[in-house]
A protein has these predicted regions:
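Short, small-residue-biased leader/transition segments that mark boundaries at the very start
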Residues: 2-6
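A short beta-strand-loop structural module common to alpha/beta enzyme folds
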Residues: 7-13
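Helix-loop "lid/cap" segments that line or gate small-molecule binding pockets
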Residues: 16-30, 87, 119-120
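Conserved donor sugar-nucleotide recognition element shared by glycan-biosynthetic enzymes
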Residues: 17, 55, 112
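Metal-dependent phosphoesterase signature
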Residues: 23-61, 69
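Short, flexible loop segments at the rims of nucleotide/cofactor-binding pockets, characterized by
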Residues: 50-54, 78, 108
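Conserved SAM-binding loop
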Residues: 55, 73-76, 132-133
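Asp-based, Mg2+/Mn2+-dependent phosphohydrolase catalytic module
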Residues: 64-67, 80-176
Length: 176
């Protein structure tokens, strides 16, 4: 049983699973290979995404409204695409998403704008035509610095960063 400081947990939140496995192995000197840690993560995560992970409050309504009004919808995730697909399929939103991109596909974590830029390229739009909805402080810094319009979506995981998130984003929403 080991604990991670808030700063590190926010950093891990923007990483791919293999990056997180490497980070955790180094930070906690775990006597497993990074691949074994990754596989442990993967198995736990798959089970959660397949059966449990809920949508954020009102996410379904927002996506449906956006599609109805002719907007394109992308999912840009630090997770692997198949995990996002599990949630989208289970919640009935898969058909409403125009593209799903991952940090792995973009070759960088959300500390780089590459994943957002890839989503834009797939939808044939520019960053100024795109609004990023995010809940991670580091991802918000990245998106804002790259010229995207940003909307912070409150998440209890980032509650300690909420004040800073609000300071740097264009808009904020707290949905319950």
């Amino acid at each position: 049983q080991r604990q991670m400081c808030i700063r590190d947990s926010h950093q891990v939140a923007t990483m791919t699973l293999i990056q997180a496995a490497n980070f955790i192995k180094e930070q906690f000197d775990i006597p497993k290979t990074s691949e074994e840690i990754f596989n442990d993560f993967q198995n736990m995560v798959i089970e959660e995404y397949r059966n449990t992970i809920p949508l954020k409050p009102y996410a379904r309504e927002l996506v449906k409204w956006m599609k109805r009004d002719g907007y394109k919808v992308a999912v840009a995730t630090a997770n692997e695409i198949h995990l996002s697909e599990m949630v989208l399929e289970r919640t009935g939103l898969m058909a409403d998403v125009d593209t799903i991109v991952s940090c792995t596909m973009a070759g960088a974590s959300k500390e780089s704008p590459a994943v957002y830029e890839l989503a834009c390229a797939n939808m044939r739009i520019t960053p100024v035509e795109c609004v990023i909805f995010e809940d991670s402080l580091r991802a918000m810094y990245t998106a804002k610095k790259a010229g995207f319009v940003t909307v912070a979506v409150y998440d209890d995981v980032a509650k300690d960063s909420w004040e800073e998130i609000c300071r740097i984003t264009d808009e904020q929403v707290v949905l319950e």
